[in-house]
Amino acid sequence: MADCLSSQLERYANQVASSAGIIISHLKTLKDEPSTLPSETTVPTAIGTAQLQLAEAAFQLLHLTRDPGNVLTNLTVDLQVISSVRWLLHFEIPSLVPQEGTISYQELSCLANVPDNLLRSHLRLAMTCHLFQESGPTGMVAHSAVSRKLASDPSLAYWGQYFANTVFPTATQSVNATATWADSKQLNETAHNLAFDHRGTFFDYIAQDPARTVEFANSMRAVSTTGPFDTCHLCKSFDWSSLGDGVVVDMGGSTGHASITLAESFPSLRFVVQDLPDVVSDSIKRLEERQLPLSVTSRIRFQGHSLFHLQPVKGAAVYLLRQILHDWPNQEAIKILRSIVPAMGPKSRIFIADIVLPKTGSIPATEERVMRCNDLLLHQFTNTLERTFEDWQAIVSRVDDRLQIQHVYRDPGSILSLLVLEIV
């Protein structure tokens, strides 16, 4: 029997007070207190746990205290917030507002070449979500901590532009895609096909233009720096130091963001990052531009390779597929895994870092909703869906009789699980 409303309110309110108390005590020990909380992945474990618990309890309280009759009002607000963020990104407002100091609406509208009244409307809605702020009695525009990060962090800017220009238009075609193709499993009958008026698969579409390939790679690198997807969770999901100086083949590794994170944490491991030639060429340049220590870059090399071709690197310690297989239907996922098996040595493992869909309500809602969101995004782009553990088992069982899932782990705060596959 479900808790009564008063019990739920009391439980979540107590959790908010308790978790906030832990975080406040920690903040008071710091020499320079930050204006916003850092990612839970960058603070001591107890503080990170408190941040996650606080976010979940506050989220539940928000929904418990909302009138169910206002659901459409709330959804309308959420939709317009998304629309305003897209508008602000399109006209490059974050980069036009000074990093420090203020700017008038009139001057900002001139710089962006947009109507003053529309600029005010979009900015003031965004301000209710802590994007930008007004300063002074005359209403000057200034950055908030969030918008300043959006303007100054290239990775976040890439993701913002990709969201505005690709993800948002694709999502708006979801209804039309279902109405047109119903239960189609074809990779080229998707919301993305309708949004961008093309007849190939999503990966065909980005491969047709090197700029699209690079844009997609940059957006994936950006996503990997956000809390639920942060590559640091990968470091905590396995005892990587036990591999010594073994080789990790980062298949479909894009710009090498996962390998770089692992290389920085485990100084003996070596890495081969594989992806399409256009991505590899750009990634090598980007690695050089980052000016990372030689102790890191000397252990990372890039290699052009198709996921569906036989794996050329033999006997690696790990073949890593991070957020790769979820892009492909079952049959293609099986082909990708089969391409690896002949290259495996007696101690080789395949690591699948992907979402394992939970039973509804079995994990914090703040984490589950990100997984469910990703589930729909996949369908809109590739006509695939995220998988349950049973789905993953079914795929692995069809690859090779000897290949088995030996271990599954999900780091707290991560939406990705690590499935460890071995030949037994």
From Swiss-Prot:
GO biological-process terms attached to the record: methylation; secondary metabolite biosynthetic process
Keyword line: Methyltransferase, S-adenosyl-L-methionine, Transferase
GO MF annotation list: O-methyltransferase activity
Residues given in the record as S-adenosyl-L-methionine binding sites: D275
Short name of one Pfam family: Methyltransf_2
Pathway where this protein functions: Secondary metabolite biosynthesis
SUPFAM superfamilies cross-referenced by the UniProt entry: S-adenosyl-L-methionine-dependent methyltransferases (SSF53335), Winged helix' DNA-binding domain (SSF46785)
Record's function text: Cytochrome P450 monooxygenase; part of the gene cluster that mediates the biosynthesis of bifonsecin B, a dimeric gamma-naphthopyrone. The first step in the biosynthesis of bifonsecin B is the production of gamma-naphthopyrone precursor YWA1 by the non-reducing polyketide synthase albA, via condensation of one acetyl-CoA starter unit with 6 malonyl-CoA units.
Protein family membership: Belongs to the class I-like SAM-binding methyltransferase superfamily. Cation-independent O-methyltransferase family.
Name of the protein described by the UniProt record: O-methyltransferase bfoD
Organism field: Aspergillus brasiliensis (strain CBS 101740 / IMI 381727 / IBT 21946)
Gene name tied to this protein: bfoD
